[in-house]
């Protein structure tokens, strides 16, 4: 896919980032606390907006993987831009129809960007925190968990069916992934496998994610 020319805008504070795109403030309110520190930018049609590198580093917690996830945020935004080109209609810009579409498939668009960028390799500590906060996550993940847990669906697919299947799923869309991505079993059994996968990720020394590469695999 030809992504065309893109400008990258670095912001010197979260307030500047929010002022540039009101969608960010709304998405932050819709996101679970365990994932909010990783909401550091947005992908427009011709621009990527992200916090400056020093601010990304400052947002990292002292747990393993946090800094790596934040440093990969620009790659995730590039993947998010590519996904929006293939699956149009998600915010930004913000509008009623775009918001409705995002609410229904946030796990897919945010999770695919996370997996393609390589962030899923470093998500274990954040997943552990999420599993100890609040109710058990839904399957597929609700919007509040999309930024953190969406990538684990693609990670499970890559482990079971291979990376090519996971990359193909990013092209095909959310309905196709759930209906045909895991052949030979129903959605309920896929949910059970996903919950087991989350539990393994949350274990000390648990497996890291299998991550795609946004620049070379999304085409």
Tell where the protein language model's regions lie, with residue ranges.
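Zinc-dependent metallopeptidase catalytic helix centered on the HExxH motif
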Residues: 33-123
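Short intrinsically disordered coil segments
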Residues: 25-26, 65-68, 130
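Stable alpha-helical elements in mature extracytoplasmic
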Residues: 66, 70, 74, 78, ...
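Pan-zinc metallopeptidase signature
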Residues: 136-219
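Surface-exposed patches in mature extracellular/periplasmic domains of secreted proteins
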Residues: 1-11, 84-85, 89-95, 126-129, ...
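A short, charged helix-loop
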Residues: 127, 132-138
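Auxiliary, metal-adjacent structural segments of Zn-dependent hydrolase domains
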Residues: 1-52
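Secretory-pathway/luminal and periplasmic proteins that interact with or process carbohydrate-rich
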Residues: 15-21, 122-125, 175-180
């Amino acid at each position: 896919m030809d992504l065309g020319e893109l400008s990258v805008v670095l912001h010197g504070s979260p307030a500047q980032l929010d002022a540039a795109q009101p969608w960010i403030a709304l998405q932050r309110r819709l996101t679970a606390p365990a994932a909010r520190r990783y909401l550091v930018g947005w992908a427009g049609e011709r621009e990527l907006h992200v916090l400056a590198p020093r601010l990304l580093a400052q947002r990292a917690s002292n747990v393993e993987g946090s800094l790596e996830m934040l440093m990969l945020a620009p790659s995730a935004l590039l993947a998010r831009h590519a996904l929006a080109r293939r699956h149009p209609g998600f915010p930004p810009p913000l509008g009623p129809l775009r918001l409705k579409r995002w609410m229904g498939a946030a796990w897919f668009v945010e999770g695919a960007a996370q997996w393609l960028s390589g962030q899923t390799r470093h998500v274990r500590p954040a997943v552990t925190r999420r599993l100890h906060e609040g109710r058990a996550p839904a399957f597929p993940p609700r919007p509040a968990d999309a930024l953190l847990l969406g990538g684990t669906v693609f990670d499970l697919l890559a482990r079971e069916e291979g990376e090519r299947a996971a990359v193909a799923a990013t092209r095909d869309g959310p309905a196709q992934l759930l209906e045909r991505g895991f052949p030979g079993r129903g959605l309920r059994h896929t949910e059970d496998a996903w919950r087991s996968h989350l539990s393994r990720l949350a274990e000390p020394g648990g497996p890291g994610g299998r991550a795609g590469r946004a620049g070379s695999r999304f085409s």
